[in-house]
């Protein structure tokens, strides 16, 4: 209503049987903390395709989606045009895919990730495709130790046109849980100077000479528009498109 999504305050989504498509669209999904995971798949009662589109999802103690069963048969997980805030602060990360009978693709696109704990994804199954593109990542108070934990290398992986930013709770960050430099590129991505990189660098990313406070209008309060006087090269190209100048 009037550009404001209705608030859905809840514990978790539960599936009592296998189902087809499950779509969450244009909702402000607020976890009440009653469950560690917004969606937890521990058996064959699973979706075929799931998507979050145009949503705000916030205050989930662990993951938005956790899959941990070889009986789970799924095709895709898609998160698009969402703001994801205060997720995974108790561990496990934004997405946690430990086991699955089948899962072909995961995409996170055109999103803002704001205060994310542990990792963006913990992936331990073989995917055909993983995409993380046009996202703005900002951690101010939260220290994320690594962006991605990819125990299984996807057949195709794309991480591009993203901005990784913020002081990260004063902690250093690795691009991955292990050395993925032989097959993982961050080409087209930017890293602000206040995000201090540990031993595993963001391969092919552009390291900026200025901080997130220099780049964004008011990042600590969720305004990730670029400061116009900066004339940032990534304007209209990198990060969540909602923050680009019209």
Question: Could you describe each region identified by the protein language model?
Answer:
Residues 224-238:
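Functionally critical loop-and-helix segments that line ligand-binding/catalytic clefts
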């Amino acid at each position: 209503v009037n550009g404001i999504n209705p608030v859905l305050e809840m514990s978790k989504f539960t599936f009592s049987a296998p189902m087809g498509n499950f779509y969450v669209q244009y909702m402000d999904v607020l976890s009440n903390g009653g469950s560690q995971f917004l969606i937890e798949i521990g058996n064959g009662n699973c979706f075929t395709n799931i998507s979050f589109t145009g949503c705000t999802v916030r205050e989930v103690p662990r993951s938005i989606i956790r899959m941990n069963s070889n009986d789970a048969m799924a095709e895709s997980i898609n998160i698009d045009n969402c703001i994801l805030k205060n997720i995974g602060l108790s561990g496990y990360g934004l997405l946690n895919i430990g086991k699955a009978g089948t899962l072909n693709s995961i995409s996170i696109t055109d999103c803002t990730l704001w205060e994310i704990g542990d990792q963006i994804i913990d992936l331990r199954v073989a995917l055909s495709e993983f995409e993380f593109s046009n996202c703005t990542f900002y951690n101010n108070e939260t220290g994320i130790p690594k962006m991605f934990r990819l125990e299984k290398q996807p057949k195709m992986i794309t991480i591009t046109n993203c901005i990784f930013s913020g002081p990260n709770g004063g902690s250093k960050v690795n691009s991955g849980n292990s050395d993925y430099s032989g097959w993982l590129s961050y080409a087209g991505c930017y890293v602000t100077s206040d995000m201090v990189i540990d031993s595993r660098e963001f391969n092919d990313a552009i390291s900026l000479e200025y901080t997130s406070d220099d780049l964004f209008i008011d990042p600590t309060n969720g305004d990730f528009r670029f400061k116009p006087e900066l004339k940032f090269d990534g304007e209209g190209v990198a990060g969540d498109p909602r923050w680009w100048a019209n």
